A protein has these predicted regions:
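Glycine-rich beta-to-alpha transition loops that act as phosphate-gripper elements at the mouths
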Residues: 32, 112-113
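Conserved GNAT acetyl-CoA-binding A-motif
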Residues: 99-111
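Residues forming the Rossmann-fold NAD(P)(H) cofactor-binding site
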Residues: 85, 89, 93
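A short, internal acetyl-CoA/4′-phosphopantetheine-binding micro-motif in the GNAT/acyltransferase core
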Residues: 76-83, 111-112
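Acetyl-CoA-dependent GNAT
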Residues: 3, 7-75, 79, 92-94, ...
Length: 113
């Protein structure tokens, strides 16, 4: 396993969308989570969303954005076979560092169980 944690771009959308669809019960909204919706989100927040990649395959993702004051982590997920290896934590750390670089210190996590 050779996992890379990096900033998400719209080029990652197909892999991220496939990951979302692979997770049972994952809440996807057709407008917000469409390619167009995610593109708008990433353009507004170009440095804060994160993916985890193993040999070119997206195995984790976080949509992360802020309004200048508060940050929010959305769609935090790791593929089933990659869980319990610290990948989720590493992605959260990278997203939090990106928020800190933009002087955002209040963060909310949106989670569905």
């Amino acid at each position: 396993m050779s996992v890379i944690i990096r900033t998400m771009t719209i080029a990652d959308y197909d892999g991220v969308s496939s990951l979302w669809l692979s997770i049972k019960g994952f809440a996807i909204r057709s407008i917000d989570d469409s390619r167009e919706g995610v593109d708008v989100f990433l353009k507004r927040n170009p440095t804060t969303s994160v993916v985890a990649e193993d040999n070119g395959v997206i195995i984790g993702s976080i949509l992360c954005g802020h309004d200048g004051r508060r940050g929010t982590l959305y769609h935090v997920c790791v593929a089933q076979g990659y869980r319990n290896h610290g990948i989720g934590k590493a992605m959260v750390v990278k997203a939090m560092e990106a928020l800190e670089a933009e002087h955002v210190s209040n963060v909310t996590l949106i989670a569905f169980t």
